[in-house]
Swiss-Prot record:
It is found in: Nucleus. Keywords: Nucleus, Ubl conjugation. Residues 244-291, 327-373 are annotated as: Disordered. The lineage of its organism: Eukaryota, Metazoa, Chordata, Craniata, Vertebrata. The gene is LDB2. This is LIM domain-binding protein 2. GO terms for biological process: epithelial structure maintenance; hair follicle development; negative regulation of transcription by RNA polymerase II; nervous system development; positive regulation of cellular component biogenesis; positive regulation of transcription by RNA polymerase II; regulation of cell migration; regulation of kinase activity. Residues 263-280 have a biased composition (Low complexity). Disulfide bonds: none annotated. Pfam families: LID, LIM_bind. It comes from Homo sapiens (Human). Belongs to the LDB family. PANTHER family: LIM DOMAIN-BINDING PROTEIN. One of its GO terms (molecular function) is enzyme binding.
Amino acid sequence: MSSTPHDPFYSSPFGPFYRRHTPYMVQPEYRIYEMNKRLQSRTEDSDNLWWDAFATEFFEDDATLTLSFCLEDGPKRYTIGRTLIPRYFSTVFEGGVTDLYYILKHSKESYHNSSITVDCDQCTMVTQHGKPMFTKVCTEGRLILEFTFDDLMRIKTWHFTIRQYRELVPRSILAMHAQDPQVLDQLSKNITRMGLTNFTLNYLRLCVILEPMQELMSRHKTYNLSPRDCLKTCLFQKWQRMVAPPAEPTRQPTTKRRKRKNSTSSTSNSSAGNNANSTGSKKKTTAANLSLSSQVPDVMVVGEPTLMGGEFGDEDERLITRLENTQYDAANGMDDEEDFNNSPALGNNSPWNSKPPATQETKSENPPPQASQ
């Protein structure tokens, strides 16, 4: 037997401690990783076109971004649409941030028909501030993302609930200004509010006004109208929607029961079976064009069950009805075979055209003549 190698990093592929390859990163988290890389590739010369391309790559056309946090004057909740998302990320860097990335820990994923939901209760937004002092801000909270279930996997909803934040200052900076009380007093003050800069907070407050004005701005851009005319048109259309009569509530359509159509064979077989059971004599069938009301009494008709357009329950059982026709005489016309034999539905060589052999009853009715002695 060969001895085990002394290399501590060696592991035999046939041993119990075989090291497998690292599994691939989960796709939704990988999209956040790609977004972090794209934010790191930002330069000081990045203009609005760069931010629009960034938002187009990672956000859907109807995406929404929501931030929830609590300030000194109470809880706040801001929701912005797709057109305002690029400007939101740009204001983060305009407030003195040099680096921005998100860290997701222990995220939970749920797959739906057309979307993937990622719920991360331990999300950290890390921002590096170069102004006025080098400070690292860690904003912790819960991040809920909804991705589209397609090849692009863009974000449809972004909801970040901030719980707490921490501002970290390097010890080296404190040691450099240990003899300067003014600088130490400045370093002791927070540079953010709940991890957000003043630029970002002011922009979110402005979005409260800008979000309802998206319709006015889009109309002005499309029809080249003056702001006053755009406002008049929007107000008139909104007034029309308000005074318009309410739409009638959609009534649930009644489930219609379909009755199975009686074919030629089923009609003839059912009538023949009923005749055999009632009279106990020869099997006789009626014509194929007889209506349902002219059939033999005590006919049991089974309706089709409701397969679509309703919930399954007692109403979806097969409906069995009994048809009674007191005007119909079962003994009238059943013994007349000429109409049946001359029916065009039967061929010339049909076995039904041949007359059945004489039975004992016919022999008794027509006795043969006796020979004269």
